[in-house]
Amino acid sequence: MVSDFHGSIEAAHKTAAKAKKTEADAIIVCGDITHFGSVEIAEKILAPLTALVLPVLFVAGNCDPSQLAEAQIKGAVNLHEQCHGLGTVSFMGLGASPSSRFYSWFEMSETKILNALMQTADRCSEGRSLVVVSHTPPKGTKVDRTFSAIHAGSASLRTFIEKRKPNIVFCGHIHEAKGIDRIGDTIIVNPGPVKHGNCAISDLDDKIEVRLESV
């Protein structure tokens, strides 16, 4: 699982090599594939991953074009406001970041974030483990704390977690907040930016296990 390529094709090739080395069953990408680039650039960044013929599930980040949220990329599954089953796991996704004073490319209001999460979860199959793939982390955790000690995650995502209790949430966005935390029984993972060599490896079978590694 990776996040925040920010246009680094080198990081994409390293991610593909890591997936091969670890015999990964799937690759999860939590947004900021580009650094204010086009859908075509996002497709080029994802190409080393889709070439592995593994499931590649992604959401767009706030530094990606909003059009990426609707884009169909060959060999990859766009999870934005969608649910996708793999084995015994339902993956649901939400791209973007909460609206902010920075006015980045792809932002959503907290109201829209909560509505989108709830509606997407309703479309996921019952009886499966539920995994949320989000660009933004939930608010008030170890993994959304900025260098200036501001918790910059989504309050709506936190509300969703408290209500729906997914098994695990994969996220990114806050580069300096690499780590693993919990909200209740839900595991929250921000691996740190893959552009700087970070990733997470997760086993989602009977007992969920997560470890932070380097690509």
Identify the residue ranges that each predicted region occupies.
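Core catalytic region of metal-dependent phosphoesterases/phosphodiesterases
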Residues: 7-86
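Binuclear metal-dependent phosphoesterase catalytic core
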Residues: 71, 84-87, 108, 155-164, ...
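Active-site environment of divalent metal-dependent phosphoester hydrolases
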Residues: 6-10, 34-39, 62-69, 99-103, ...
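Conserved catalytic scaffold of divalent metal-dependent phosphoesterases
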Residues: 20, 64-156, 214
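Active-site neighborhood of phospho(di)ester-bond hydrolases with catalytic His/Asp-centered motifs
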Residues: 1-3, 27-32, 56-62, 78-80, ...
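A general structural detector for well-ordered alpha-helical segments in enzyme core domains, enriched
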Residues: 15, 44-48, 116, 153-160, ...
